[in-house]
Amino acid sequence: RSSDLNDLGKKLSEKPAAILASVVCLLVPIQMVSQTWDDHDRSGRYTCRDFGQNYLNSVQDNGKPILFTNGDNDTFPLWYNQDTEGVRTDVRVCNLSYLQTDWYIDQMKRPAYDSPSVPIKWDRIDYVSGHNEAVYVRPEAMETVLNFYKQNPEEARKEFGDNPYELKNILAHWVRAPKDPSLQMIPTDSIVVKLDKEAIKRSGMLAPDSIPEYMHISLKGKSVLYKSELMILEMLANANWERPMYMAITVGPDNHLNLTNNFLQEGLAYRITPFDNVALGRRIDSEKMYDNLMHKFKFGSIDNPDIYLDETVLRMCDTHRRTFVQLATQLIKEGKKDKALKALDYCEKVIPSTTVPHDYVMSSSKEMAEDYIQLGQCQKAEKILNALANNAVEYVTWYLSLNELQFANSYDNCMRYFYILDDVCKTLSEIKDAKTGKVIDSATHYTNKFEQLYKLLEKRANVGSAQ
């Protein structure tokens, strides 16, 4: 009996410990949820859907446009909108990362929703895996080709077409079906495309008064073209500008096929045109872009302070703000100041700094302030510049508080914020007080702050060199 009593006593003494352990274990996930719930709460946030629609609504309303994308964030939200929401099913979204594969080219050659097949006329054997994965660019062959045309003009035209450097002839005679496999190449680094002027006028693109006879595509700096690039050229050769083609602004320059100068921005997409828009002094179709941003774009409730915006969403918010600034700058350049001011004010309304902080680099916020200054809205400019300056001061102050090893590892970042603070101070100094005509107080304040912090930097540098 005594042993039974001892066993009972042990069990009773262990029971509170077990209960306590259970309570502690239950508290751990509760603590985790309470601390991280807001970081994962996506309720009320529609940025993914709306920003995807903004890409789709950046392209022309008619003509069954093709929109080239490259990554995840500029592709899957677009597919979701088309597949689930039924938005802009006339647009063919073409992901360049997949365009290197035969199965995806098969898909592109089939209709989808309200979009006809893309203008790729190659037989499957020409693009099946292992065929035309890459074709070399051989500009050194140009002289030999020209000599062949001089010496044997009829035979040359029969084999390579009237112009061996015209895009259609290069694709047909040099890339797809050369008589000699050793001739499979692109025999020039300067391709031409014969232009149908009437088709261009019908296309809806912003065109100059004088349309040239040819479009020039430079391949300088390229030694090889990969299958996806050949497919872009194939589409360019066959679309005849009546099927609008666009490149999402998030596609990197490496995938631009040296067509960057031919781009004309209309929103979150560049329209591919046959013109050198840099030479024409324009990179934006301001009328189309204004209409898209002001009347078609949605912003997924990012102005709601109760909605959590993570790093990825903030990056896309910065992209949208930057796009507004680019539009406003172009409108100012064109003398359309009323529209420029409306665009900037609307940007501040739908992408407020209370939820999407102004950023010197990512948001083009300094350029936004400069636009406001040009429009005579100095108070609005000062507010933005003060936010940028204050942010830089906080970062520099923090970097200067680090120990020697940490500071040494962070030196470049610290100097970057010194540069930002200095640059913002210069812009603030351009704003004069409306009553006194003198430099505004915030310019003096942040200039003094810069000098104080720079003295601390010099002091730290001297201490470090002495050690």
Regions found by a protein language model. Name each.
Residues 73-74:
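Alpha-helix capping/helix-boundary segments
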Residues 3-64, 79-467:
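ER/secretory pathway lumenal C-terminal domains and tails of membrane proteins involved
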